[in-house]
């Protein structure tokens, strides 16, 4: 029988300045904290926060996900962040507000939503 592999405790990195990436789609919100080079420090999603189905896309679910990711980033010493927002979802503002309320100093906010220059054909309109 093979011996169980010994894994050391997760080391704490001290990263005072980072970037918060908020990807808000129509179905989910993903919040990722990285260092300035783009290496991931912490992340959370509204689906991973316990919300399923259509509740994942609510602003409250985005707020909970942002709080979870922010808590993990603060454990690694992060204090100042720039915010990059991508996507059309409803959780954009709520996630930004949650990051600010978690005690981070926000240095900049940029919208990096990709805009097609007449690229792919969009999905057909829903008839409900």
From Swiss-Prot:
Keywords: Ribonucleoprotein, Ribosomal protein, RNA-binding, rRNA-binding. GO terms for cellular component: ribonucleoprotein complex; ribosome. One of its GO terms (biological process) is translation. It holds the Pfam family Ribosomal_S11. GO terms for molecular function: rRNA binding; structural constituent of ribosome. InterPro entries: Ribosomal_uS11 (IPR001971), Ribosomal_uS11_bac-type (IPR019981), Ribosomal_uS11_CS (IPR018102), Ribosomal_uS11_sf (IPR036967). SUPFAM superfamilies: Translational machinery components. Located on the platform of the 30S subunit, it bridges several disparate RNA helices of the 16S rRNA. Forms part of the Shine-Dalgarno cleft in the 70S ribosome. NCBIfam families: PRK05309.1, uS11_bact. Part of the 30S ribosomal subunit. Interacts with proteins S7 and S18. Binds to IF-3. Belongs to the universal ribosomal protein uS11 family. This is Small ribosomal subunit protein uS11. It comes from Solidesulfovibrio magneticus (strain ATCC 700980 / DSM 13731 / RS-1) (Desulfovibrio magneticus). The gene is rpsK.
